[in-house]
Amino acid sequence: LLDTATLSSAASLDLSSVSPDVISPGDLPGSVAFGINPRNASAPALPTTFSYDSTNFLGSFSGTIEHTGSVFFNADAVEVGNFTIGFDGNRAGTLGGAASGFFVESTTGIAAILFDIENPSNLVATDSSLTIDANLLVSPEFGQFLVDQALAATNLQGADVGDARVAAVPEPTGLALLALGGLAVLRRR
């Protein structure tokens, strides 16, 4: 659930539209979702390279989960999209200990890490599926961008602005992800 009211009041960002490849609505009312790019995606889409060992998920996570599609704000003047979900151990424990190390990066429009993913409230990693539910926290990079662009009066880093769900299905012969899952960004009201 993306807290559009908080983004509007705190950061002057008003959701205006989504690109045609975004699933709207997603599985839940008021949501948008992004399919996971396949491992064999070709340019300009980035291929998903993510893999893990279900017995040691956090210790074995490698690669990224890639998505195609954009979300637009302020009469389509501000674009974020073609999201990468990745892991950086140096981010773990930041934001007052809340950051898990996972992040959401926009690779089009505002090309920056937008959100740190909080330590998950739900994490189920098996050989046949992966589900992660967690809060989206404004990253230090996005917080500074909002201040620099005069969209926010103060740096909002660490502010909870929504919830993320990653639902993915590994290939039966390995742990590569298919385009059967997605990152859901939902409006929170």
Which residues make up each language-model segment?
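Short, threonine-centered small-residue motifs that mark membrane-proximal processing/anchoring sites
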Residues: 161-183
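Predominantly extracellular/secreted and cell-surface proteins with exposed
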Residues: 23-109
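Contiguous ligand/interfacial binding patches
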Residues: 108-141
